[in-house]
């Protein structure tokens, strides 16, 4: 109605932060563009190569000018990534030196974006959620971080002789064309990358299927199957890239929409070990030891991916 009183948001003074608020990750270039919550934080705009701010996951209609509207401020400085994260009261500061980054995972599940930085020190990873519509800006940030953590790298490893450049015929990947498309994007942006291996998604069965409990488990898995999701591995002389789903394991018949990319500097890999999966037959778990941090990749036991990981070239070998 025309005579209805204005909403609370419109009765409050407008602010530049509120005017610009939306689901997008923005680049920050001036002190005025820094969200007010973080303005006293340890971020040097002049010395940072890229600074971005990540908005809260709320609808525009639910925002007000008096709210702190940004969840994170990320600054790629000369030696470290600094992440300021909003809390109920104030914010926390996390500093991740580039030399201690073990792996970077980024990707989306529809519009649910997630960036995770794994440290080689064994501490908890740093995770930032964002709207998937801003994946391009997040990719720019990841590219800056990777350039810094590869600076001075002397890995220069010789890839396996059967590593292949260019196009690959992905058989049985009809349900995972999104991963194939992501692999194509990697090749276009990084021509030096070579294909190592891939495995398609497959339904798996429990390893121990004896007795009454085994029969019950088989019945449950028949009605509600467990699927090990597909993945593609590629590399250049300094980095391993794994293209995968956010969840390696999916139960039932639910559709899978996520696409993630994990990059690992080869220089950080101390060793790779493979062990049989505790529950599922025909699956091995490759553990990449990166300092005090371990990343696990489940792959089919007889797949090219398992073979590639068994003979992975390591700088410390």
Model-assigned labels for residue ranges:
Residues 89, 93-98, 116-118:
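"Short basic amphipathic alpha-helical interaction patches in structured regions
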Residues 96-100, 106, 110:
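Elongated alpha-helical scaffolds
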Residues 79, 85-89:
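N-terminal beta-strand/beta-hairpin edge segment
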Residues 1-68, 74, 78, 109-110, ...:
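Intrinsic disorder/low-complexity detector
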Residues 82, 100-102, 268:
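Residues located in well-ordered beta-strands
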């Amino acid at each position: 109605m025309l005579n209805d009183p204005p909403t609370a948001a419109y009765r409050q003074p407008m602010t530049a932060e509120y005017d610009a608020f939306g689901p997008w990750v923005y680049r920050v270039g001036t002190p005025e563009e820094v969200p007010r919550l973080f303005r006293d934080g340890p971020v040097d705009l002049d010395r940072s190569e890229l600074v971005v701010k990540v908005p809260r996951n709320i609808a525009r209609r639910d925002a007000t000018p008096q709210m702190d509207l940004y969840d994170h401020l990320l600054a790629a400085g000369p030696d470290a990534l600094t992440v300021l994260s909003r809390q109920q009261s104030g914010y926390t500061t996390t500093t991740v030196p580039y030399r201690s980054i073990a792996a970077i995972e980024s990707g989306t599940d529809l519009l649910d974006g997630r960036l995770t930085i794994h440290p080689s020190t064994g501490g908890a990873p740093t995770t930032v959620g964002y709207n998937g519509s801003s994946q391009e800006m997040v990719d720019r940030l990841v590219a800056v971080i990777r350039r810094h953590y590869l600076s001075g790298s002397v890995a220069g490893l010789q890839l396996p002789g059967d590593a292949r450049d260019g196009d690959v015929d992905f058989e049985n990947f009809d349900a995972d064309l999104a991963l194939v498309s992501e692999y194509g994007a990697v090749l276009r942006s990084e021509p030096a990358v070579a294909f190592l291996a891939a495995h398609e998604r497959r339904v798996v069965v429990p390893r121990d299927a004896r007795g009454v409990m085994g029969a019950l488990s088989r019945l449950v898995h028949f009605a509600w199957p467990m699927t090990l999701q597909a993945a593609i591995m590629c590399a250049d002389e300094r980095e391993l890239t794994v293209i995968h789903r956010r969840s390696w394991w999916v139960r039932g018949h639910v559709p899978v929409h996520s696409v993630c990319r994990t990059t690992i500097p080869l220089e950080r890999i101390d060793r790779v070990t493979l062990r049989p999966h505790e529950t599922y037959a025909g699956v091995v778990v490759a553990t990449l030891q990166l300092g005090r941090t371990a990343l696990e990749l489940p792959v089919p036991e007889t797949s090219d991916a398992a073979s590639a990981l068994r003979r992975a070239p390591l700088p410390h070998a």
